[in-house]
Amino acid sequence: MNIAVFASGHGSNFQAILHAIDAGLLPARIVVLISNKSDAGAIEIARAHNISTQHLSQKMFSSEEALADAILEVLEKEHAEFIALAGYMKKIPAHVIQQYQNRIVNIHPALLPSFGGEGMYGRRVHESVLASGVKVSGATVHLVDEEYDRGPILLQKTVTIVSDDTPDSLAAKVLKIEHEIFPRALKAFAEGRVKIEGRKAWITS
């Protein structure tokens, strides 16, 4: 399975995917790294692994449609079959979602459908989780549709919140399980073990 990874930041989830591929745990190949930030750490990781990189930002285009066309041109050129959003902080254009329906997944640092939606990313998520008083948090891998964090949930794993947790300590715990479940979800897709029916998605054995 040829995967295009989209990332905006340091690229730790991107790195986790690469580790899984290198270890023979994920039968896939990363064909391109696309980022909306020219200085994203993920770009350096891609270059170190001789993976093609593309900087594509809405600021470079006159409309969302123009950005979508540019993204789709890159995906076609690189023969990308699947898209993994690994810390990508921008909404995917609707036309890209339509062309890759049920072939885009995102990793979110909380247990959706709680603590998701527009603007809920990074430290903000963990601050909101702790402020709510819930006793568990976690990570969610979900399919991407045209609403923020509303696509069918595929995989989740929890962490326990303790009384002295801070946004930073909770983020570290959640990030650890993100690195575990994201490659696992991609492996299920690569092996054809994902079933999707309406708003429900699950992995078969």
Please provide the spans of the model-predicted regions:
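One-carbon transfer enzymes
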Residues: M1-S205
